Design a protein with these regions (language model features):
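N-terminal intrinsically disordered/low-complexity leader segments
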Residues: 1-25, 36, 220
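Helix-turn-helix
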Residues: 2, 29, 37-75, 79
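Hydrophobic alpha-helical connector segments
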Residues: 75, 89-123, 143-144, 148
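Secondary-structure edge/capping motif, primarily at the C-terminal ends of alpha-helices
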Residues: 88-95, 124-132, 160, 188-192
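Amphipathic alpha-helical segments used for helix-helix packing
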Residues: 114-140, 151-157, 186
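Amphipathic alpha-helical packing segments from all-alpha helical-bundle domains
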Residues: 135-162, 171-182, 201, 209
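Amphipathic C-terminal alpha-helical segment
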Residues: 174-196, 209-220
Length: 221
């Protein structure tokens, strides 16, 4: 009688990854449906009912995965962060580049990934300004995402410190870059130049200036 119980136990263990994969697949399907509707109708005019119909699931099932559209937005931002971190860790050329180029590449890739969803991102950032929003930097729901991003940036700056590219900046360097990143996204949202070229020029100039100031402590850049 032991063998059947062991077999059942193995079946249960083997079923867990499959259930997790199915749940993640459902989350991805919901996100794709939501992003398509956000592009058509906008973030505010898209209802959870419309998202569930587009994703071909019951509205109650949608709420099991995402309580609100803000939860969907947080999931989207997590997916984008995962993509950028994975890209950075696999791109040896960027990892070996000077610090300004590494930091430029990170923000550039974020902007490139966000470009198809510009209106949605604008709505998300406006919601993030509301203290009661889950998207607010002060909310508990957004803290895990923010800390992962800060650690990612801090690791890059720490390597630059070890290589002597910049003096020790500690955690404040990661916070400063995060604020700069936010400022660049805000500028990008307002940029109406062809190909957002003004944003890219501003990004390049600011990073070169900041790195020079850290290394030389002078304004002659």
């Amino acid at each position: 009688m032991k063998a059947p119980r062991q077999s059942a136990r193995r079946s249960q263990i083997g079923g867990r990854p499959r259930r997790a994969e199915k749940k993640e697949s459902t989350r991805q399907a919901i996100l794709r449906a939501a992003l398509a509707l956000f592009a058509q109708k906008g973030f505010y005019r898209t209802t959870t009912k419309a998202i569930s119909l587009k994703a071909k699931i019951a509205e109650g099932t949608l709420f099991n995965y995402f309580e609100t559209k803000e939860d969907l937005a947080l999931y989207f931002l997590d997916q984008e962060l995962d993509g950028v971190i994975d890209w950075f860790h696999h791109d040896k050329r960027v990892q070996g580049a000077p610090l300004p180029e590494r930091l430029f590449s990170i923000i550039y890739l974020f902007l490139e990934r966000l470009a198809p969803y510009e209106e949605f991102i604008g709505a998300v950032y406006l919601r993030a300004l509301q203290p009661s929003s889950k998207l607010s930097p002060l909310s508990l729901q957004s803290q895990e995402h923010n800390v992962r991003y800060l650690r990612f940036v801090r690791d890059i700056l720490a390597e630059a410190e070890r290589e002597g590219e910049i003096p020790k900046v500690g955690d404040i360097g990661a916070y400063a870059f995060a604020l700069f990143h936010l400022a660049m996204i805000t500028y990008w949202l307002q940029d109406r130049s062809p190909g957002k070229e003004q944003t890219l020029a501003m990004l390049d100039r600011c990073l070169k200036m900041a790195t020079h100031l850290l290394k030389k402590g002078a304004w002659d850049w």
